[in-house]
């Protein structure tokens, strides 16, 4: 294959700006799929991806395009997820490319998440082609958006294609720009030892783990013994090939190409995205740059509502782990919810997607506890432990100080929402860093704030304040000391472990009062009075009382029979006292969900 005719590229766009639609048009124009085979968002293979209109797993396709210069070019389109939780997957897929198409909606302009991915592309030295989409809509303002891109990122937009991915208008210009602007693979030398980047992996029940790779140097053939440079394990290549989007088998992939490799690998945990493949004989000396081990940022307990489903739930998690290497879980028990698992996620969207997939694909009925982050607890004896669950917090006497993860948050917002969003960030213990003007209508706010505050209803409030127009992205900046306490909820004097949470001291009273009030509304009245208390240690922060049903035991008495009346009321009082001592309170499922949705 002529290396100078290869073009490897990604499409970068914010959710709903038309990335998957543009990918579909490109597949049509290059005759990769016929109109009859076409289904919307062809590259998004999971139902949930099509429904939510977001790309979660990566996909790569090989296309052939006959350009206006009469030459035929081989394109490798690598689809990337656009959401902040999957930023590492984006950075790995960008590392497999030489160029990126930046799709921006002509009606909305550039968004915070897109900026983050553009900077990732610039870090990977990619050639960026700006494309303005949805120019056929009445509210489109392509000139303003061009100016915005030039001012914010500094990319020349004078000849940016103005397209409508939906109708196919000017999409041909995008293909010509790929040919003329994106460089051919610059380091593609078949003679060097093999170095190939793994940018994605998935599980196939016949082939085992299938790796999506970009061959940087050397070549890889069926029968080769390959070695993963991060952990040193070796395998024999059983099958390899490309996708167009159907799977096509080949004998060999050479430098510059993008394809897939299967090598009878049993579990996806053996494969790390971002790792480098080389051959056992004639090995490369150094892996490719940029490999990172992914760590979950958010944890929560997930339990089956029907305890008989525990085994099914366990098997479902094992199967999901095969296709999602960033998923981490361990068994956990709760007095309130029974047996379940503590599951770790990359972020909130990842958590929602996983839970939805478990319920939808495996017919499970699940309940999740409030999400929490990983806290670092420094003890008085000089040691440090990490916890992701309030139940694991040691005795306060043994704690010297606690640290929590902080993130740098960038918010793109219309000017009229700036004041309210600044108040929101301050209420979430944010530290103001910067305010930048993006264009006449929009500004960018920059804050540092605790990750725990973001996973707690920040996104919903941001959207409601800005009427849906603001967008945000965050990145980890490390751990900082915080005034943290563990808050427990007592029902009738008994602690309910599923309601415990670690909160900032400043918020403890607010959260406690809001939660007790909410639980009072949601827990049905019992035959006895039930106190609902929020406590820190022995100190009660807030209390609500669920009133008892009043049963009239004196209804059949004569009005003058006072001693009999007193006797019956005393008997009822004794009965209630006894009941209160042994009575357990039924907590409905809505109450557990209320903790997650608590709007303080």
Curated annotation (Swiss-Prot):
Domain tr-type G, chain residue ranges per copy: 4-186
Report membrane topology. Peripheral membrane protein
Give GO terms for biological process: positive regulation of translation
Q: Which organism is it from?
A: Mesoplasma florum (strain ATCC 33453 / NBRC 100688 / NCTC 11704 / L1)
List the disulfide bonds in this chain.
none
Which keywords accompany this UniProt record? Cell membrane, GTP-binding, Hydrolase, Membrane, Nucleotide-binding, Protein biosynthesis
Q: Which PROSITE patterns match?
A: G_TR_1, G_TR_2
Q: What is its EC number?
A: 3.6.5.n1
Q: Which Gene3D superfamilies match?
A: 3.30.70.240, Elongation factor 4, C-terminal domain (3.30.70.2570), Elongation Factor G (Translational Gtpase), domain 3 (3.30.70.870), P-loop containing nucleotide triphosphate hydrolases (3.40.50.300), Translation factors (2.40.30.10)
The record's comment on protein family reads:
Belongs to the TRAFAC class translation factor GTPase superfamily. Classic translation factor GTPase family. LepA subfamily.
One GO MF term on file is: translation elongation factor activity
CDD domains from the UniProt entry: EF4_II (cd03699), EF4_III (cd16260), LepA (cd01890), lepA_C (cd03709)
Record: residues binding GTP: 16-21, 133-136
Q: What is this protein called?
A: Elongation factor 4
What does it do?
Required for accurate and efficient protein synthesis under certain stress conditions. May act as a fidelity factor of the translation reaction, by catalyzing a one-codon backward translocation of tRNAs on improperly translocated ribosomes. Back-translocation proceeds from a post-translocation (POST) complex to a pre-translocation (PRE) complex, thus giving elongation factor G a second chance to translocate the tRNAs correctly. Binds to ribosomes in a GTP-dependent manner.
Q: What is the protein's major site of localization?
A: membrane
Where in the cell is the protein located?
Cell membrane
What top-level class of enzyme does the UniProt entry assign? hydrolase
Gene Ontology, cellular component aspect: plasma membrane
Task: Report which reactions are catalysed by this protein.
Answer: GTP + H2O = GDP + phosphate + H(+)
Q: Which HAMAP family match?
A: LepA
Q: What is the gene name? A: lepA
């Amino acid at each position: 294959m002529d290396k100078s005719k290869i073009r490897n590229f990604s499409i970068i766009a914010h959710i709903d700006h038309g990335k998957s639609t543009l990918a579909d048009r490109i597949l049509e124009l290059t005759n990769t799929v016929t109109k009859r085979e076409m289904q919307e968002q062809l590259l998004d293979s999971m139902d949930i991806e099509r429904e939510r209109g977001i790309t979660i797993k990566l996909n790569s396709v090989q296309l052939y395009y006959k350009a206006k210069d009469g030459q035929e070019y081989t394109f490798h389109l690598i689809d990337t997820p656009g959401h902040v939780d999957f930023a590492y997957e984006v950075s790995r897929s960008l590392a497999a490319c030489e160029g990126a198409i930046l799709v921006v909606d002509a009606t909305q302009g550039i968004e915070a998440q897109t900026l983050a991915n553009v900077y990732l592309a610039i870090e990977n030295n990619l050639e960026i082609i700006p494309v303005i989409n949805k120019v056929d809509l009445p509210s489109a303002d392509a000139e303003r958006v061009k100016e915005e891109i030039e001012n914010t990122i500094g990319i020349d937009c004078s000849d940016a294609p103005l397209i409508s991915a939906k109708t196919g208008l000017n999409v041909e210009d995008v293909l010509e720009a790929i040919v003329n602007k994106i460089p051919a693979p610059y380091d593609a030398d078949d003679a060097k030892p093999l170095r190939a980047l793994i940018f994605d992996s998935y599980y196939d029940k016949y082939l085992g783990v299938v790796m999506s790779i970009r061959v940087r140097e050397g070549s890889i053939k069926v029968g080769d013994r390959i070695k993963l440079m991060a952990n040193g394990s070796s395998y024999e290549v059983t099958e390899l090939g490309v996708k167009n989007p159907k799977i096509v088998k080949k004998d060999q992939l050479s430098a510059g190409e993008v394809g897939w490799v299967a090598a009878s690998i049993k579990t996806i945990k053996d494969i790390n995205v971002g790792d480098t493949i080389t051959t056992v004989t004639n090995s490369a000396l150094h892996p490719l740059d940029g490999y990172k081990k992914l760590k979950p940022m958010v944890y929560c307990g997930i339990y089956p509502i029907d305890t008989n489903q525990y085994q099914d739930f366990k098997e479902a998690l094992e199967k999901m782990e095969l296709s999602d290497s960033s998923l981490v879980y361990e068994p956990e028990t709760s007095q309130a919810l029974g047996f379940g698992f503590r599951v770790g996620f990359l972020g909130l969207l990842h958590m929602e997607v996983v839970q939805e997939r478990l319920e939808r694909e495996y017919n499970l009925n699940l309940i999740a506890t409030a999400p929490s982050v990983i806290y670092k607890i420094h003890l008085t004896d000089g040691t440090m432990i990490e916890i992701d669950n309030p139940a694991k917090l040691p005795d306060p006497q043994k704690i010297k100080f606690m640290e929590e993860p902080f993130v740098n948050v960038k918010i793109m917002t219309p000017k009229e929402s700036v004041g309210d969003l600044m108040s929101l960030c301050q209420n979430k213990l944010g530290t103001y860093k910067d305010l930048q003007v993006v264009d006449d209508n929009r500004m960018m706010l920059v804050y540092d704030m605790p990750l725990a505050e973001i996973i707690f209803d920040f996104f919903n409030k941001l959207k409601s304040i800005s009427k849906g127009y603001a967008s945000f992205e965050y990145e980890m900046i490390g751990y900082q000391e915080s005034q943290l306490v563990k808050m427990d909820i007592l029902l009738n004097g008994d602690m309910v472990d599923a309601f415990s949470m670690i909160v900032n001291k400043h918020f403890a009273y607010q959260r406690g009062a809001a939660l007790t009030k909410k639980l009072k509304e949601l827990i049905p009245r019992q035959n006895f009075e039930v106190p609902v208390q929020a406590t820190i240690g022995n100190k009660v922060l807030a209390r609500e009382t669920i009133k008892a049903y009043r049963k009239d035991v004196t209804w059949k008495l004569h009005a003058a029979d006072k001693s009999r009346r007193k006797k019956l009321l005393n008997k009822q009082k004794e009965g209630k006292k006894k009941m209160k001592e042994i009575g357990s309170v039924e907590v409905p499922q809505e109450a557990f969900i209320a903790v997650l949705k608590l709007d303080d």
